[in-house]
Amino acid sequence: MAKLSKRMKLVRDSVDASKEYEINEAVVLLQKLATAKFTESIDVSVNLGVDPRRSDQNVRGATVLPHGTGRTVRVAVFTQGANAEAAKAAGADIVGMDDLAAQVKAGELNFDVVIASPDAMRVVGQLGQILGPRGLMPNPKVGTVTPDVATAVKNAKAGQIRYRNDKNGIIHSTIGKVTFTPVQIRENLEALLAALIKGKPSGAKGQFLKRISLSTTMGAGLKVDTSSVKATVA
């Protein structure tokens, strides 16, 4: 039998796999178990009461977390004219049109979010095979194709997350770092849940938020007692 590492022993001795943890208790325990040599993220998985095989029950959107994600986000914007100046003033890291497209085609993808004004989609549309597989393709459904590029840049910099359920109807997202306080993590989680409830498909029947679990980048998952989190009645 393989010898358990100190980390795995700590997890084994600390986590009750059958328990649903109160949100603050869950965060404190995750922080205790976060022993990696880097600052781990805290991630959430939310099982939704949807049928992901039906296109009208897929959930997709974006929301700004009140305390951000703890990440420094680099933003690229495809736009021109006055919008280009507005994007730069809002904090965009890279702004351009054909010149920016050339950088992307050359493999220079040193950004985390791509935003485009509608008039720039003629250029961005040529980059679908590069941006799409990386989850970077601008989309109006999540606010990354918009005439108001300045607000989109500010949202991205402020900690906006984009989410989409997977083939099993589960939403996965990062909601902070282990250095955040339990209150910050709870409020970020509540903001995400409120956005999910707001976007609940009309065809979804029964309980919408079925199960919530938290984990760290390198750690075990903990089930969360949904009654300890606001905005979970759905």
Curated annotation (Swiss-Prot):
GO CC: one term?
cytosolic large ribosomal subunit
Keyword set, alphabetical order: Repressor, Ribonucleoprotein, Ribosomal protein, RNA-binding, rRNA-binding, Translation regulation, tRNA-binding
GO molecular function per UniProt: rRNA binding; structural constituent of ribosome; tRNA binding
Tell me which CDD domains the record gives: Ribosomal_L1
* Pfam families xrefs: Ribosomal_L1
Report if keyword Acyltransferase is assigned. Answer: no
Under InterPro entries, the record lists:
Ribosom_uL1_bac-type, Ribosomal_uL1, Ribosomal_uL1-like, Ribosomal_uL1/biogenesis, Ribosomal_uL1_3-a/b-sand, Ribosomal_uL1_CS
PROSITE patterns reported for this sequence? RIBOSOMAL_L1
One GO BP annotation is:
translation
HAMAP family reported for this sequence: Ribosomal_uL1_B
Assembly description: Part of the 50S ribosomal subunit.
Question: What is the role of this chain?
Answer: Binds directly to 23S rRNA. The L1 stalk is quite mobile in the ribosome, and is involved in E site tRNA release.
Query: Family, per the entry?
Result: Belongs to the universal ribosomal protein uL1 family.
Q: What is this protein called?
A: Large ribosomal subunit protein uL1
User: Which lineage is the organism of this entry classified under, starting from the top rank?
Assistant: Bacteria, Pseudomonadati, Pseudomonadota, Gammaproteobacteria, Alteromonadales
